[in-house]
Each structure stands twice: as structure tokens, then as C-alpha cells.
UniProtKB/Swiss-Prot annotation:
The gene is pgk. ATP binds at K204, E326, G355, G356, D357, S358. InterPro entries: Phosphoglycerate_kinase, Phosphoglycerate_kinase_N, Phosphoglycerate_kinase_sf. It is an enzyme of class 2 (transferase). Substrate binds at D21, F22, N23, R37, H60, L61, G62, R63, R121, R154. Gene3D superfamilies: Phosphoglycerate kinase, N-terminal domain. This is Phosphoglycerate kinase. Keywords: ATP-binding, Cytoplasm, Glycolysis, Kinase, Nucleotide-binding, Transferase.
Length: 400
């Protein structure tokens, strides 16, 4: 990674203005149901505290549409952070985001203390990347630290704008994300295999196009595999397909051949007579899908084929489920990929899981710890896989 990080700064007495990603899921009572994103920011916060900084944290939470909404207050996050961070002498919260009240709260901070600003999206200027808001935020710190990989693909006042007014460096989480995903794309250990799933091919065209020039094998699953199978002239029954994407699927298959990448499609599938966990189901070859039935998972032969590819790889990136894994009878394919990734890790491969649903699948299977890297950013990891430059990363200072 060719960007400066928090290691490149002498923090003694300095105010570290840190953009974190505390956009955590809350239940109806406003309790945090998964604190992974808070935990992911702890190494950066701890390092700053240990090196004598005053730490000011900013994050968004949910979609409050540019105005204060108690439902999206960062209060529960502050309470959880206090529990997770006993080494902070104090974790304070302010109702302000910018302006005199925020500046006063920052001026009271001592080294070793943490202040959390209120939800940045309570201000309509945040998502507009308003330079005035960015300048107001910059008054609160001496150095800007971006550790919010999950929002690095969005040019907001607190992720990109503020970097124009302060020296800007990456936190450890941002560094880890860019090192793993960027490293895999630019200089992978081979064989390099990617597994791409999810419902729609249209969501992942950019990713597949970018990967075809880099990977040894691309394994396709989920609803998007149906459109590839349709492009090969197969009957998909009542399955989810995107007829308008058939020409794109044909182009991608031709491009794979041209570039010497193997593009693998399911050979058998689990089909059901309705979109329901209670539906009748059976396993058939992809050439024998009857009308009135729909594909909801990859079949056992495909699982074996894909698992063998993953186990023999040295670098694997997985983005998107293999079937409707939220319905138990159609979760086997996605689970098997998670298991094969864990086995590849045990064999010394670099295994990277990126994207919401695959992350959830790995966590449900209890295998997250077995992966080299589980990405915290859905949209951001997708854009990196597409080969795009992320605004929040571009704004950081280059390493010398």
C-alpha cells in the first residue's frame, strides 16, 4: 500500500480526527446486534491512545436523511466502545458534529481520552461532500485518520472532503483492507481463484471484467450463474434470470477464453417447485431443469468441483453466496465454499472474503477466524475488485 499510515506520525499531544465505520446493526430496542465494526477499529484507536494522542471519532449510522433522528444516535456505540476499550481513561460523547459545541468538547480532551462526535449524517452537508462542513470538521483535529474502509468508496465530507484541510493518513483497518485486496489483485500468489455469487450478473459485470485479466479460474454461483447458463442455451425453468444480460454473459465467456482464464459454471443444481424452505426439491444436472422449477443452490457435483479448485489455490477471493442461503435447504453450497476456503487457509493460501452476504455466511458457519481476511466493506470491496480508485483512499497522503 503506497499511502502514509498512523505509524508515520508523531502523535504526542496531537488531536487525531478519526473517521471510523460504526454503522452497526441495531434491533428494535436500539441495542447493537453485531459489534464487529466497532472491534475492527480498536487496533487503530489503541495505537493512537498508546502514542499520546487525543482521539476524536466520527462515523455515520444508518440513513437519517440529513437531519437528527434519535433512532440513529451513536449513543449505543459509545456505551459499547467504553466496554471494549478499558485503556481509554474516558470515552465521551457530544451531541455536536461541528461548530462551537464540538470545538469546546475537543478543547477539554486530554491525551488518553476519546470523544465521539454525533452521527455525521445528521448534517445534510455530509453526503454532499460540502467543503464548508469538511473545513469545520478539520478544525477539530491536527491529523485526519481514515479507518473507515466501508465508506471509502463514497466521497463524503468526513471521508474525503476533510482530507483537503488536514494531513491525511490511513488507520490499520484501512491499511489491512488495501493490502489484502489490493495485493491479491496486483501481485497474487498463484493459482489465483475467485468465487463470484449473488443474484444478479448486472451487479458484478465490472468485477468479473476486471478479474478476467488477473485470475486463473473464476467460479460462478448464485442467481447470476443462471444467466450464464441461459447464455449457453439451457432451459432454466422458472429460475431468476436476466435475459437482457445474456449478451454480456456471452461476451464475458468469450473474454475468459481469450485471456486464458477458466470460467466455471455449475454442472448440477438444487431446484425447488417454489421459493420456500418447505418447497419440494431435487438435484438435477443443469441440462435437465424442468419447467415450473427454479434453481436455488449449486448441487453436490458442483460443490465438489468448486471446493477442489479452492483447496488447490494459493489466493482466493470470494464475493457473493452460491444460493438462497437464508433458506436452510438451499444453504449447503454457500456453506461448502466457506468450508473449502477454511481448508485452503489451513494449507497456507491467502483467503479473502468480501461482501455482505459472504461475510454473514462465513460468520454463521463459525469460520471467520479461519480466513486470512474478512472484509468490512461491501460496496467498497466491490469497487476495489472492479479496479476503481476509492475517493477516501485517493485523498490520503502518498508514502514517501
Amino acid at each position: 500500500m503506497n499511502k502514509k499510515t498512523i505509524r508515520d506520525v508523531d502523535w504526542a499531544g496531537k488531536r487525531a480526527l478519526v473517521r471510523v465505520d460504526f454503522n452497526v446493526p441495531l434491533d428494535e430496542q436500539g441495542q447493537i446486534t453485531d459489534d464487529t465494526r466497532i472491534r475492527a477499529a480498536l487496533p487503530t484507536i489503541r495505537y493512537l491512545l498508546e502514542h499520546g494522542a487525543k482521539v476524536i471519532l466520527m462515523s455515520h449510522l444508518g440513513r437519517p436523511k440529513g437531519k437528527p433522528n434519535p433512532k440513529y444516535s451513536l449513543r449505543p456505540v459509545v456505551e459499547r466502545l467504553f466496554e471494549l476499550l478499558p485503556e481509554a481513561t474516558e470515552v465521551k460523547k457530544t451531541e455536536a458534529i461541528t461548530g462551537p459545541a464540538a470545538e469546546a468538547a475537543v478543547s477539554m480532551l486530554k491525551p488518553g481520552q476519546v470523544l465521539v462526535l454525533e452521527n455525521t449524517r445528521f448534517d445534510p452537508r455530509e453526503e454532499a461532500n460540502d467543503p464548508q462542513m469538511a473545513a469545520e470538521l478539520a478544525k477539530l483535529g491536527d491529523v485526519f485518520v481514515n479507518d473507515a474502509f466501508g465508506t471509502a468508496h463514497r466521497a463524503n465530507a468526513s471521508t474525503e472532503g476533510v482530507a483537503h484541510y488536514l494531513p491525511a493518513v490511513a488507520g490499520f483497518l484501512m491499511e489491512k483492507e488495501l493490502t489484502y485486496i489490493g495485493g491479491a489483485l496486483s501481485n497474487p500468489q498463484r493459482p489465483f481463484v475467485t468465487v463470484i455469487g449473488g443474484a444478479k450478473i448486472s451487479d458484478k459485470i465490472g468485477v468479473i471484467e476486471n478479474l478476467l485479466g488477473k485470475v486463473d479460474a473464476l467460479l460462478i454461483g448464485g442467481g447470476m450463474a443462471n444467466t450464464f447458463l441461459l447464455a449457453k442455451g439451457l432451459n432454466l425453468g422458472d429460475s431468476l434470470v436476466e435475459p437482457e444480460s445474456v449478451p454480456v454473459a456471452q461476451q464475458l465467456m468469450a473474454k475468459a477464453e481469450e485471456r486464458g482464464a477458466r470460467l466455471l459454471l455449475p454442472v448440477d443444481v438444487v431446484i425447488a417447485d417454489a421459493f420456500s424452505a418447505e418447497a419440494q426439491r431435487q438435484v438435477v444436472e443443469v441440462t435437465a431443469i424442468p419447467s415450473g422449477w427454479r434453481v436455488l443452490d449449486i448441487g453436490p457435483k458442483t460443490i465438489e468441483l468448486y471446493s477442489a479448485e479452492i483447496r488447490s489455490a494459493r489466493t482466493v477471493i470470494w464475493n457473493g453466496p452460491m444460493g438462497v442461503f437464508e433458506l436452510e435447504p438451499f444453504a449447503a453450497g454457500t456453506r461448502a465454499i466457506a468450508q473449502a476456503m477454511a481448508e485452503a487457509s489451513a494449507n497456507g493460501a491467502i483467503t479473502i472474503v468480501g461482501g455482505g452476504d459472504s461475510v454473514a455466511a462465513v460468520e454463521q458457519a463459525g469460520l471467520a477466524e479461519k480466513m486470512a481476511h474478512v472484509s468490512t466493506g461491501g460496496g467498497a470491496s466491490l469497487e476495489l475488485l472492479e479496479g476503481r480508485v476509492l475517493p477516501g483512499v485517493a485523498a490520503l497522503q502518498d508514502a514517501e
